[in-house]
Amino acid sequence: MNFNINQSSISDAITKTFGNLTINWPFFVFSFLTLILVVTIVTLLVYKPLKKMLKNRQNFIQNNIDESIKAKEAALKVQEEIDEKIIESSKHANQIIEQAKLERERIINNGIEVSNKKAEIIIEQANILVTKSQAEFENKQRKIIVENAVEIAKKIIGREIRDKDNLKMIEEMLES
């Protein structure tokens, strides 16, 4: 019940407030023209520059997106080129390493060959030296034996052997 009282008092208040409202046509036309004028001014001074600014901003953003896509594509292309150069460099490095190994083996083989030749020469020289030393040793031994034989013959014969023919004969006997 109290609810009905409040509701009717609210209705009465609304009717009082809006009941006296009537349309004032000159004021309505003036307000309408003012609204059109304000909308036109806002459109010309705010909306169109704002729209133009947003369009420019959109173009700027789109250009940046396009440029970043182009830059990304260029970066990918450069990355591919760099990867290809790295692969090529690796292959080239492997070829250089293989060539170095072959050169090393060639140098080692040449060194071994030269060393073997030098060793053969040294051995040959040593053999010649040994043969020469042995011949000198044999000659010295023969000389000592001849001298000893002459001394023994002197003692046996009891006289000195001065005759060159006798000395030659003794030497020939010892040599054979």
From Swiss-Prot:
Q: Does the keyword Transport apply?
A: yes
How is it placed in the membrane, per its record?
Single-pass membrane protein
Compartment(s) where it occurs, according to its Swiss-Prot or TrEMBL record: Cell membrane
Instruction: Name the Pfam families for this protein.
Output: ATP-synt_B (PF00430)
- Keywords, A to Z? ATP synthesis, Cell membrane, CF(0), Hydrogen ion transport, Ion transport, Membrane, Transmembrane, Transmembrane helix, Transport
Query: Which residue ranges run through the membrane?
Result: 27-47
- Molecular function GO labels: proton-transporting ATP synthase activity, rotational mechanism; proton-transporting ATPase activity, rotational mechanism
Top-rank taxon: Bacteria
The record, for InterPro entries, names: ATP_synth_b/b'su_bac/chlpt, ATP_synthase_B_chain
**Cellular component aspect of the GO annotation:** plasma membrane; proton-transporting ATP synthase complex
Role noted for this protein: F(1)F(0) ATP synthase produces ATP from ADP in the presence of a proton or sodium gradient. F-type ATPases consist of two structural domains, F(1) containing the extramembraneous catalytic core and F(0) containing the membrane proton channel, linked together by a central stalk and a peripheral stalk. During catalysis, ATP synthesis in the catalytic domain of F(1) is coupled via a rotary mechanism of the central stalk subunits to proton translocation.
Q: Which family does it belong to?
A: Belongs to the ATPase B chain family.
Subunit structure of this entry? F-type ATPases have 2 components, F(1) - the catalytic core - and F(0) - the membrane proton channel. F(1) has five subunits: alpha(3), beta(3), gamma(1), delta(1), epsilon(1). F(0) has three main subunits: a(1), b(2) and c(10-14). The alpha and beta chains form an alternating ring which encloses part of the gamma chain. F(1) is attached to F(0) by a central stalk formed by the gamma and epsilon chains, while a peripheral stalk is formed by the delta and b chains.
**PANTHER family named in the record:** ATP SYNTHASE SUBUNIT B', CHLOROPLASTIC
- This one is known as ATP synthase subunit b
Organism, per UniProt? Metamycoplasma arthritidis (strain 158L3-1)
Q: Which gene encodes it?
A: atpF
